[in-house]
Amino acid sequence: SFREQCVPGREITYECLNACAEYAVRQ
């Protein structure tokens, strides 16, 4: 999920960016 993949201090990965995009779309 967004919170699981995009947490402070963790490297920004392609999967993270995808999760962020999906999270934004659902809001």
Curated annotation (Swiss-Prot):
TM annotation in the entry: none
Keyword Cytoplasm recorded: no
Keywords of this entry: Allergen, Secreted
The keyword tRNA-binding is annotated on this UniProt entry: no
GO cellular component, as recorded: extracellular region
Localization: Secreted
Similarity comment: family membership: Belongs to the protease inhibitor I6 (cereal trypsin/alpha-amylase inhibitor) family.
Descriptive protein name: Allergen C-C
Organism field: Triticum aestivum
